[in-house]
């Protein structure tokens, strides 16, 4: 990746590729909250970072773990299978990097893998593509995976 020039990085970013700098923090999954939200920590010692996966929406669970939407537990279980505790992940943000709840908004990748976890949720049938303007970067991949 270091051999790619600045224009190449811009072109890759525009094409929907994850462009994560070499000095980006390394993250690991602490736990899965629901089908589209995880908690991560990083190698800088920060813990409890709440991450909302962009461009995908799954059934919601309330704070007690009770169902608010059909298949909420199944969506959470599926994401837990994809991202068990301790899994190394890479995060890629878009135009707005946090939401009104203070969650980091990101595309999530297994470390060293180019498969977008956000799209894998839709591909598995546990979520649907959702466009949250102005964040559009991951929407085409998630929509295509439905």
Where are these predicted regions, by residue range?
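Small beta-barrel nucleic-acid-binding modules, primarily SNase/OB-fold domains
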Residues: 2-146
């Amino acid at each position: 990746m270091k051999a790619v020039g600045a224009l190449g990085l811009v072109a890759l970013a525009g094409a929907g590729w994850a462009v994560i700098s070499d000095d980006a923090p390394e993250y690991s999954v602490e736990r899965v909250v629901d089908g589209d939200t995880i908690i991560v920590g990083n190698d800088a010692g920060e813990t409890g970072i709440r991450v909302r996966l962009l461009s995908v929406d799954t059934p919601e669970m309330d704070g007690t773990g009770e169902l608010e939407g059909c298949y909420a537990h199944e969506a959470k279980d599926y994401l837990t299978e994809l991202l068990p505790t301790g899994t190394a992940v890479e995060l890629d943000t878009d135009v707005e990097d946090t939401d009104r709840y203070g969650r980091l908004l990101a595309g999530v990748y297994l470390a060293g893998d180019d498969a977008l976890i956000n799209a894998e949720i839709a591909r598995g049938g546990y979520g649907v593509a959702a466009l949250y303007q102005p964040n559009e970067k991951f929407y085409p991949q998630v929509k295509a995976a439905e």
